[in-house]
Amino acid sequence: MNQSLGVLRLTRGVIALALASVASGCSSTGADRTAATPAAANPAATEPVKWECPAGYEVKEGLNVDFPHKGMKRAFIVYPAKNVSGPAPVWVPMTGSVESTNDNLTVARSGANSILADHGYTVIAPVRACANQDPNIRGERCNGPGSNGWNWNPWFEGRAADPSGEHWKNDEGPDSSFFVAMVQCVGTKYKLDARRLFLGGISSGGTMTNRALLFRSNFWAGGLPISGEWYVTSDDGTPLSFDDARAAVAAAPTKIHQGRVGPYPLPAKVGPLIVMTVWGGEKDLWNCTRPDGSRFLCADYRPSTQAGSNFFSAQPDVVHVACSSTHGHMWPQLNTQEFNRWALDTLASHPKGSDPRSFKLTQPPEGYTCHVGPFTGLY
């Protein structure tokens, strides 16, 4: 779960009290990746990727630890693509607050994203900094409010609502830059398709996806934010309470809302990208726990995902797909592996630099409703 405004500190593990709301959607494509016909490309719109590692670092299959980045030692897991002769598309999946990195990679209800390596994707899974390089750490260490100017603990994904967050208004933070460095290093050992670099995640991982795309749209080809936050603010960047953020989006559901998920102000232009936003339906909510053990609603993923879809859909070089289902605040539960492959195949059908006008959305798996553009009908 992600939180938006932290005026009062409570616990679930520990939790920041108020949130800017969220609403998102889910997207994918039924076409087989190898059979997909890429859209007309504009390679000039992309920047070349430099495959390089920190001095002396060597990548291996499986868990990689002690990766030096911005004064920290980070970890990531590599599942090389199978049955691919040329450069493979890349999938960088992220867990949220409660489940571990290995859950997200191997447990069915958490996405089991490692299976995508069997379908031709090189899967590179970053381990959260809060987990101290241990991919088995769950919410006992990572679920709760952030520190040092960050709103939420699992990922460095949104600036705090108090003055400490000011530092991150136009600084991407150590996770967004780590993901880029990680992929660049993996590319020294495995052939990677520089025009098909994708990332995505659930909850805080979805929020982190939004942040990475907003700060690094020159690197990523696209992303899959599932129930991610936008941390909606007022137009001048002033943080809003949970209730005020919900009300702001409800009052103007088609507006481009500023948010603490990205730089302030939001970029005038991003892309080229393909972004698929997933909203888990009416049950895509999160309850936090007060110190006395009582529960209260602290996250609603309708308004934040609406806000994210509005921004990306308004960008001329971005294809945005809005998808909805009924699984609530979880990794998509209906036909999970079919959804995962369909979503990644949809992303891969639109390599970086492709003409958005050439994009064709295919039928999603049963249980999902998707369309090109922002969410409609949520308000």
UniProtKB/Swiss-Prot annotation:
Assembly behavior: Monomer.
Xref: SUPFAM superfamilies: alpha/beta-Hydrolases (SSF53474)
UniProt record similarity statement: Belongs to the peptidase S9A family.
EC code(s) of this entry: 3.7.1.7
Protein name per its UniProtKB record: Oxidized polyvinyl alcohol hydrolase
Active site: S203 (charge relay system), S309 (charge relay system)
Sample GO molecular function, one term: beta-diketone hydrolase activity
The keyword Membrane is annotated on this UniProt entry: no
Protein keywords: Hydrolase, Signal
Record's signal peptide: 1-23
Catalysis: reaction(s): nonane-4,6-dione + H2O = pentan-2-one + butanoate + H(+)
Disulfide bonds listed in the record: none
Domain of life: Bacteria
Record has Iron-sulfur as a keyword: no
Function: Catalyzes the hydrolysis of 4,6-nonanedione, a beta-diketone compound. Also mediates hydrolysis of oxidized polyvinyl alcohol (PVA) in the second step in the degradation of polyvinyl alcohol. Not active toward the monoketone structure.
